[in-house]
Amino acid sequence: MRKISCIILDDEPLAVALLENYTSKIAQLHVALATTDVFQVVDYLQNNKVDLIFIDIQMPEISGIQMMEMFNKDSHFIITSAYPNYALKSYEFRVVDYVLKPISFDKFHKAVTKFLDFSIEATTTALFVKAEGKQVRLNPNEIYFIEGLSDYI
């Protein structure tokens, strides 16, 4: 399975450390950058792409909303914020989930699972087979056995 590259951006060093700890417990995640420095993320994203960004909303230099406006077409976001009042605005972007601080591993894991389910769905190709005179769409991930019958599968 392909690793999901991600960035952790929060102006609180303890929040960055907590999220780094949580990401290390999920095998599919690879942290490309974890920082409190917004400009380091901007520089990184000008030359690199990541799948997922864990981002705080209220930061001193550039807000999380401004960051999402800048990089919305390239990445998905999981917002980690102490303030619920930005939730509605944030869904104008590619936000997978809005997780309120303090963040438990359970809440974090649910948000990541939501992204993983979404990314698997988006990359899964459909398989069409003829059954009972019509075309039926199948998800290849749901096929466990195939039986051959003469010249047919």
Task: Show the residue positions of the predicted features.
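Non-catalytic signal-transmission and effector/linker regions of two-component phosphorelay proteins
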Residues: 1-5
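CheY-like receiver
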Residues: 14, 25, 38-122
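Conserved RecA-like P-loop NTPase ATPase core
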Residues: 19, 87, 143
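Two-component/phosphorelay signaling modules centered on CheY-like receiver
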Residues: 12-33, 70
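Cofactor-binding loop segments of dinucleotide-utilizing enzymes, especially the Rossmann-like FAD-
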Residues: 11, 82, 148
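Conserved binding/recognition cores within well-folded domains
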Residues: 113-153
